[in-house]
Amino acid sequence: MTATALRTQINWWRGCQRACDRTGYQYLHRTNRTASKEHVQILVLGGGSGGVTMGARMKRKVGAENVAIVEPSEMHYYQPIWTLVGAGAKSVESSGRPTASVIPSGVKWVKSRVTEVNPDTNSVRTDSGKEISYEYLIVALGLQLHFEKIKGLPEGFEHPKIGSNYSEKTVQKTWKALQDFKEGNAVFSFPNTPVKCAGAPQKIMYLTDAYLRKTGKRSNANIVYNTSLPVLFGVKKYADALWEIVKARELTVNLRHNLIEVRADKQEAVFENLDKPGETKVFKYEMLHVTPPMGPPDVLKGSPLADEAGWLNLNKETLQHNVYPNVFGIGDCTNLPTSKTGAAVAAQSGVLDRTITRIMEKRQPDKKYDGYTSCPLVTSYNTVILAEFDYNGQPLETFPLDQSKERRIMYYMKADVMPHLYWHGMLRGLWGGPGPYRTLMHLGMK
């Protein structure tokens, strides 16, 4: 090859490189940036009960291709059944299914965690760096468990005799502690924060009592329920019934006691008397069930969507955001002044579905959520008090009988009917709570 030909080839190669820099390389980076941005008509944050339910409802409204759900978890759990898992009546495996199996078919699953919400630009950002813009946003992020706010936890769970029905990682530890119980105190806590399913901390107490009686250990046990609340239950009708059970079964209830420390190596739980700040009492335990402090998701706290306490700031009747009209919410992450339960989510879903329809039609919402929620208070291995009530703490019962009484049929509903209704009705957007049936059963009088 001559020198002239060599120079020509080198110049040609350099020209190709410059062209590649100007076109191919930049094009690749442009497409990468483009690929990191997406747009969807309806974006759902969270793939728990509220998120999947609304995803299914929105799919029918605008088509699956126009809906996306952001959720990082591989597994989806029916958490209400964990009360029975902790008492050995159900398996933890029966409570979970792969998230992929519950995401509505055709709806896009963004398997990431939301790290930033920007309602002023109608966009969110995920931990993978992806930016997703939306026309309508449904926030269903649930709440956070804060075991770490109790000194000695979560590392204390490495020791036996301590469990919690609030996590799939710790619920089986409750059952193990119950089985291994020999004699002494069985202690149960309720934190000084909002919680999901406010009845659950005492349900496991009643089941522990029943188990110890069944196994002949009850005479060696002192069962203690320490709650931060000033009442046993928030609705007087059901609280009165529960106090009767507490007295009949010789259970100890200490109001306004908040768990602040667990000394797992010594089997000691330290509670603060909230009526006398700074005053503490140490309880030795043979078994300890911890209900952790809870709070709003970090991504909400301090965001424009949150109220002063960090919860999603909603109109309590329409479930529309109080500031951003194209933002809506459902479930545990909201500031709705009602008990955070799956039953509440079901009732909210029907109202929210209607609200979004009206907003899309540029009309005012016309359906109102009354705060309906339900708590099946498990009182033994075959009885339940089915508490149902509204925003005002007034009973809103479905059946034409006194639901403050323990009933076997209600246990059957809790253990078998409600899980089926959840998986096959609610998550498919087909169950919006018992409202219509309540009206029917009460002959139109409720």
Where do the language-model regions lie?
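SDR active-site lid
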Residues: R363-Q364, D370, T379, E388-E397
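FAD-site-proximal beta/loop scaffold in flavoenzymes
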Residues: H146, E155-K182, K284-A347, T357
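Beta1-alpha1 glycine-rich phosphate/pyrophosphate-binding loop at the start
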Residues: A35-K108, N192-K236, L443
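Internal hydrophobic alpha-helix adjacent to the cofactor/substrate pocket in enzyme cavities
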Residues: A210, V345-G371, L377
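Hydrophobic/aromatic beta-strand patches that form the interior of the parallel beta-sheet core
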Residues: A68-V70, V110, I138-V139, V187, ...
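A Rossmann-like FAD-binding core segment of flavoenzymes
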Residues: A64, S105-V117, V124, I132, ...
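C-terminal auxiliary extensions adjacent to catalytic cores
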Residues: L386-K446
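FAD-binding core/adjacent interface of flavoenzyme oxidoreductases
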Residues: T2-V40, V107-G216, G278, H289
